[in-house]
Amino acid sequence: MAQKKGGGSTRNGRDSKPKMLGVKAFGGELISAGSIIVRQRGTKFHPGTNVGVGKDHTLFALVDGHVSFGTKGAMSKHTVSVTPA
């Protein structure tokens, strides 16, 4: 006869890996063209001048320069721009 109960299976034990979202280059920082500025879900930050948008809403620099954050429009949307260096 068994001295211990059988170790049944559990329905837990899974977790998704971290997605590493957020701001990668901060205001005033010098970055090169193609550098990722913000990784995000949806458009929390909108592209300004010299900033492109990837298919997963990632914002990246189109030119070398300094990053600047600001707001735009009546709804005060957060924008990210790159000023050429």
UniProtKB/Swiss-Prot annotation:
Source organism superkingdom: Bacteria
Biased composition (Gly residues): 1-10
GO biological process entries: translation
Keywords: Ribonucleoprotein, Ribosomal protein
Matches recorded under PROSITE patterns: RIBOSOMAL_L27
Region Disordered, annotated ranges: 1-20
Keyword Amino-acid biosynthesis among UniProt keywords: no
GO cellular-component term (any): cytosolic large ribosomal subunit
Pfam families reported for this sequence: Ribosomal_L27 (PF01016)
Any one GO molecular function term: structural constituent of ribosome
Keyword Zinc attached: no
Family: Belongs to the bacterial ribosomal protein bL27 family.
NCBIfam families to which the protein is assigned, alphabetical: L27
Protein name per the record: Large ribosomal subunit protein bL27
Organism per entry: Paracidovorax citrulli (strain AAC00-1) (Acidovorax citrulli)
